[in-house]
């Protein structure tokens, strides 16, 4: 099954996540199909916290992709911000 989930990057104690479409059988930081955004949980000041390509999220969900719990909350936040 294809899932939309977070892929961890950044430095020790400074996480930075890419939002990716990946096969659920792959490892967390392994190969992915498409990068559709990022999430910076430690953003401060003017730094951008979240960027998602909502059109691509809708495309993948329409084609049967599942969302991880955290990504589902992030998509909901992004939709609120876009409205």
Curated annotation (Swiss-Prot):
One of its GO terms (molecular function) is structural constituent of ribosome. One of its GO terms (cellular component) is cytoplasm. InterPro entries: Ribosomal_bS16, Ribosomal_bS16_dom_sf. GO terms for biological process: translation. The keyword Ribosomal protein applies. Coiled coil: none annotated. Keywords: Ribonucleoprotein, Ribosomal protein. NCBIfam families: S16. This is Small ribosomal subunit protein bS16. The lineage of its organism: Bacteria, Pseudomonadati, Pseudomonadota, Gammaproteobacteria, Alteromonadales. The gene is rpsP.
